[in-house]
Amino acid sequence: MSVDLATVKRVARLARIAVSDQEAERMTSEINGILGFVEQLSEVNVDGVEPMTSVMPMTMKKREDVVADGDKAADIVANAPNSDRNFFVVPKVVE
């Protein structure tokens, strides 16, 4: 898999990131290098290899999962430039 210059420019536009033509060309080669490495990783045979979460064997500490609102809504939106009924109000950015 590889990406072309048009794809990089399209993704930058969707992410609302200003990218010059020179930067887009550089990013195209960097992204293609990363994708090439990922393709190499997919070729590695990992049959029989147990997934690893840490290099040190340890058990995760667990706690009871309790649902709570924290009663901090007013404190959280206190410094927001614009809020409505304890919700952040932000300008529309998605077309």
From Swiss-Prot:
Task: Please state what class of enzyme this protein is.
Answer: ligase
Q: Which EC number applies? A: 6.3.5.-
Keyword Protein biosynthesis on this protein?
yes
Assigned keywords, A-Z: ATP-binding, Ligase, Nucleotide-binding, Protein biosynthesis
Molecular-function GO term, any one:
ATP binding
Q: List the disulfide bonds.
A: none
The subunit field of the Swiss-Prot or TrEMBL record says: Heterotrimer of A, B and C subunits.
> Family, per the entry?
Belongs to the GatC family.
Which reaction(s) are listed as its catalytic activity?
Answer: L-glutamyl-tRNA(Gln) + L-glutamine + ATP + H2O = L-glutaminyl-tRNA(Gln) + L-glutamate + ADP + phosphate + H(+); L-aspartyl-tRNA(Asn) + L-glutamine + ATP + H2O = L-asparaginyl-tRNA(Asn) + L-glutamate + ADP + phosphate + 2 H(+)
Q: What is this protein called?
A: Aspartyl/glutamyl-tRNA(Asn/Gln) amidotransferase subunit C
SUPFAM superfamilies from the xrefs? Glu-tRNAGln amidotransferase C subunit (SSF141000)
Functional summary from the UniProt entry: Allows the formation of correctly charged Asn-tRNA(Asn) or Gln-tRNA(Gln) through the transamidation of misacylated Asp-tRNA(Asn) or Glu-tRNA(Gln) in organisms which lack either or both of asparaginyl-tRNA or glutaminyl-tRNA synthetases. The reaction takes place in the presence of glutamine and ATP through an activated phospho-Asp-tRNA(Asn) or phospho-Glu-tRNA(Gln).
* Record GO biological process: glutaminyl-tRNAGln biosynthesis via transamidation; regulation of translational fidelity; translation
Matching InterPro entries, A to Z? Asp/Glu-ADT_sf_sub_c (IPR036113), GatC (IPR003837)
Which organism does this record belong to? Answer: Sinorhizobium medicae (strain WSM419)
